[in-house]
Amino acid sequence: MHGADSIKACIGPLTSSPKLLELFMKVMSDAEVWRYDPFTERSMWNPALFQKKKLRVGYYADDGYVTPHPPVIRAVNEYLDKIKKLSFKHVEIELVPFTPYDPSGAVHIISSLYFPDGGKELKEELSSVGESLTEMSKMALNNPSVQRFNIEELWKAHTQRDTFRWNLMHEWTKAGIDMLITPVLPGAAFKFGTCNYWGYTAYWNLADYTSVSVPYSSVKASDKPVEDFKPRNKLDAEWQALYSPETYEGAPLSIQLIAPRMQDEVVVEALKLFSDIN
């Protein structure tokens, strides 16, 4: 929607290898697109951002709000174990547990800022061409955080967004990490119309941080549900109820690498560094 920049969107490349991703980023940087697009920030590609003798890598498999399905936790832990076992030239890797700042609050803020008009324009555009809302769009619009803001309410929501960013930066700096490893979703590739939580990526959209996702592993028959699962909240219970290894066996899983804003080089170089993990 034109003019709706409470949460800015960008187009991310989809490539078949870390080297092709790096090539794309270099080409876009060398093209100096900021000379032609007033909404693009000046940023020269600088791999030196990654040139450290020691890299502190934060991680979490669970955001503390919605519990991932068992194969996701297994995949993240496997990925971390392989990092520990690999020998890297010229760099020492230190893995550091990280607790994300206020994930439930982040989901509330970004859910409201996706549709600051309460979804009015989206519904009107779909109606004008005879299209109906998909199940995923219905879930997003029916979120209790979605409302039509007046200008004072929008300013307040922007202040909440900015306060979240300040507090997250404080936690990140206090942890002393260079980058972070997390799940992309708290589940595998999902059945159409069933995904009701995307906070593991939306969190970083709200933060305006850089991330790259990489496929890793898939659901196995041995990834059994947690017995006597005790949900933290209603959403946690609903999410966990979606899972069974019979339904998801073979479905792909993904890991994401995250770095602060304008540090794309860090995640691309890390992806290259970890490219032997499979």
Regions found by a protein language model. Give the residues of each.
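Short glycine/threonine-rich loop-to-helix capping motif typified by GTGT followed
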Residues: V72, A106-D117, F190-N196
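Flexible, acidic loop-helix segments that line cofactor/substrate-binding pockets
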Residues: E41, A61, F98-L113, M136-R148
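Aldehyde/semialdehyde dehydrogenase
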Residues: T67-D81
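Structural helix-boundary/capping segments
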Residues: M1-Y60, N77, K82-K84, S145-R148, ...
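Amphipathic alpha-helical segments in well-structured domains
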Residues: I73-N77, F115, G119, Y197-T201, ...
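Serine-dependent amide/ester hydrolase catalytic core
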Residues: A61-P68, K120-P231
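Preference for well-ordered, secondary-structure-rich cores of eukaryotic proteins
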Residues: K26, K52-V57, H108-G118, L126, ...
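General small-molecule cofactor/ligand-binding pocket signal
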Residues: K89-T99
